[in-house]
C-alpha cells in the first residue's frame, strides 16, 4: 500500500489555511494545520469534518513551539513531503510615514518572513526524508515591485509598508533558496493565492482558476 504524502499548512489571520488543508485532504495527503491564537480558537470550534486533519496550536514566532510541531511530525510520520508557509499578518492599512510604528513593522516581519526562515531551517531534515519534497511560500502581489510601480495595478496606491515590504523580502528569500536548493531534491516556490479582481483586501478567497494552479503544484 502506498504511503500517503504528509503536508504541513501554517495558518494565522488570512483564513486560507483551512481551504488549503481541505484541498490537500482531497488529494490524499495527511495534513497538519498549524494555527496560532485566534485562528486556532476559531478552527477548534468548528469540529466535525475539520478533524480529518490534525489541528496543532503553534506560535510561529517561537522556536520552542515550532520544535514541538517538528517533534509531532517526526514521531507520527518520520518525514515531511510538503510545507505550505501560509501564516501571515497585516497591519497599518493606509498609514503614511508619520504614522508607522517600528514595533508594528517588526511584528509583521516576525510572522511573514522570519517565521518562514525559521520553519524551513527546522524542517529541512524532515523534508530531506521525502522522495519529492516541496515548499510553497504564500506571497502577495503587494510584494511585487513591478506590479506596485504600475499605476494601472489596482493596489498600486495602497500604503501597507510592513506587509508589502515583508512580502517583497519573502519573494527574494524564496528566490535565493531556490538557487540554494537547486542541486538537491527540495523544490521551493512562491504562490499568490488571491485573484485581484475586485481590488479589495476584505475578500480573501481562492477563485477556481487559482485553485487549479494550486492543485497543479501539489500533485
How does the language model describe each region?
Residues 89, 93-108, 128, 132-182:
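Catalytic loop of short-chain dehydrogenase/reductase
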Residues 72-85, 91-93, 101:
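A glycine-rich helix->loop->beta "capping" turn
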Residues 48-64:
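Rossmann-fold cofactor-recognition segment
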Residues 27-42:
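Conserved glycine-rich Rossmann-like NAD(P)H-binding loop of the short-chain dehydrogenase/reductase
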Residues 13, 17-22:
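N-terminal Rossmann NAD(P)H-binding glycine-rich loop of SDR-like oxidoreductase domains
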Residues 84, 119-123, 127, 173-174:
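Hydrophobic positions on the long internal alpha-helix
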Residues 168, 179, 183, 190-219:
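C-terminal helical subdomain
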Amino acid at each position: 500500500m502506498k504511503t500517503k504524502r504528509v503536508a504541513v499548512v501554517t495558518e494565522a489571520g488570512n483564513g486560507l489555511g483551512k481551504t488549503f488543508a481541505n484541498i490537500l485532504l482531497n488529494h490524499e495527503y495527511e495534513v497538519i494545520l498549524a494555527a496560532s491564537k485566534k485562528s486556532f480558537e476559531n478552527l477548534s470550534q468548528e469540529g466535525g469534518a475539520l478533524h480529518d486533519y490534525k489541528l496543532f496550536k503553534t506560535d510561529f514566532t517561537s522556536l520552542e513551539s515550532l520544535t514541538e510541531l517538528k517533534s509531532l511530525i517526526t514521531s507520527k510520520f518520520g518525514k515531511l513531503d510538503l510545507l505550505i508557509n501560509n501564516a501571515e499578518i497585516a497591519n497599518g492599512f493606509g498609514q503614511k510615514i508619520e504614522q508607522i510604528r517600528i514595533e508594528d513593522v517588526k511584528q509583521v516581519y516576525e510572522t511573514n518572513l522570519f517565521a518562514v526562515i525559521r520553519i524551513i531551517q527546522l524542517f529541512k531534515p524532515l523534508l530531506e526524508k521525502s522522495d519529492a519534497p516541496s515548499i510553497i511560500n504564500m506571497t502577495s502581489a503587494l510584494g511585487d515591485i513591478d506590479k506596485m510601480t504600475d499605476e494601472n495595478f489596482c493596489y498600486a496606491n495602497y500604503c501597507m509598508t510592513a506587509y508589502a515590504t515583508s512580502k517583497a523580502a519573502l519573494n527574494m528569500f524564496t528566490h535565493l533558496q531556490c538557487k540554494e536548493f537547486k542541486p538537491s531534491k527540495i523544490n521551493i516556490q512562491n504562490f499568490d493565492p488571491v485573484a485581484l479582481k475586485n481590488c479589495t483586501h476584505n475578500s480573501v478567497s481562492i477563485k477556481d482558476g487559482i485553485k487549479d494552479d494550486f492543485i497543479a503544484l501539489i500533485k
